[in-house]
């Protein structure tokens, strides 16, 4: 007989405001424990130094976390000019010090170089793997391995301020963009070196900044629930966003309840008006209940790709 997973069935997304100094996995496990969720996963790690938006998917929402991994991100970053470190951030050792002598015109010209579609060579201090091992493990042993450049897009790069030797930028970029690498490359282009001293992720996809919560806020709600002798879920669950927000940019296909049984068994159903290979959000009936994602095939049929398991316990919806 299959063993029931520990924790309760709860499906939704927490917009965690990660604090500095902790790993993304540590933050994930804390959220999972606060919600007593049977399953949890994050949607793109932040360095321990970094703070800000870390969407945590609970329960069936984990099936759609890849779509948030692929989403655009936005960051506020402050760089210290005149010093280059081995990790390109303040957690590393200073390896070179140079005077800061560039002009404002040179700075603005250098920033223009990073806008749009470019190629980026990932830092050795990254979680990308080479022969099964994360690059940072090689770096810590003083070993440099070959890395191929990867295409990235910087949609916006806004100059915020330059105060003394500290430069602050706002960067809206595609998935897989390493902000530390942008800062290191910028420092070399300016001839003075630079490294990240503050990094805050302010946006993932279209999630609102104002919806973020900290671990301290979650812990306070759990404490409050215990003091009031109520289940913590009463105070915590209203913070969850519906899991279909992870695929909010997909067009919706509403399927009649009569077709639900076919879909939930993995069978394709006929839908008109959409091109082949279009990924869609599937909802059922007049309530537009989200049940997963699918794709249109060449025959005009909607084939389910990722469907949720519907439990007796509540699913977070609008």
From Swiss-Prot:
Keywords: Isomerase, tRNA processing
Active site: 47 (nucleophile)
Gene Ontology MF annotations: RNA binding; tRNA pseudouridine(55) synthase activity
PANTHER family: PSEUDOURIDYLATE SYNTHASE TRUB1, TRNA-PSEUDOURIDINE SYNTHASE
HAMAP family, per the entry: TruB_bact (MF_01080)
Role according to the record: Responsible for synthesis of pseudouridine from uracil-55 in the psi GC loop of transfer RNAs.
Protein name: tRNA pseudouridine synthase B
Gene label: truB
């Amino acid at each position: 007989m299959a063993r029931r997973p520990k924790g309760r069935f709860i499906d939704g997304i927490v917009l965690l405001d990660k604090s500095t100094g902790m790993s993304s996995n540590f933050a994930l496990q804390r959220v999972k424990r606060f919600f007593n969720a049977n399953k949890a996963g994050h949607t793109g790690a932040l360095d321990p130094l970094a703070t800000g938006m870390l969407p945590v998917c609970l329960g069936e929402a984990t099936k759609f976390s890849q779509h948030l991994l692929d989403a655009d991100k936005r960051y506020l970053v402050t760089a210290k000019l005149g010093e280059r470190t081995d990790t390109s951030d303040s957690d590393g050792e200073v390896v070179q010090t140079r005077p800061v002598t560039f002009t404002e015109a040179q700075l603005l010209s250098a920033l223009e170089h990073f806008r749009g579609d470019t190629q980026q060579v990932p830092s050795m201090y990254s979680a990308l793997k080479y022969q099964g091992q994360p690059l940072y493990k090689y770096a810590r042993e003083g070993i440099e391995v070959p890395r191929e450049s990867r295409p990235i897009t910087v949609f916006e790069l806004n100059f915020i301020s330059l105060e003394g030797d500290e430069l602050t930028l706002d960067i809206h970029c595609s998935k897989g963009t390493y902000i530390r690498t942008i800062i290191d490359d910028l420092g070399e282009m300016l001839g003075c070196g630079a490294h990240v001293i503050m990094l805050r992720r302010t946006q993932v996809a279209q999630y609102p900044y104002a919806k973020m919560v900290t671990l301290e806020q979650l812990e306070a709600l759990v404490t409050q629930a215990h003091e009031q002798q109520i289940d913590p879920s009463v105070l915590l669950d209203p913070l969850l966003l519906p899991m279909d927000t992870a695929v909010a940019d997909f067009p919706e296909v509403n399927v009649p309840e009569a077709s639900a049984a076919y879909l939930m068994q993995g069978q394709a159903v006929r839908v008109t008006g959409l091109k082949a290979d279009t990924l869609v959000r599937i909802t059922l009936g007049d309530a537009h209940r989200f049940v997963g994602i699918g794709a249109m095939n060449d025959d005009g049929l909607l084939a389910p790709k990722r469907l949720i398991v519907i439990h007796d316990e509540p699913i977070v919806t609008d």
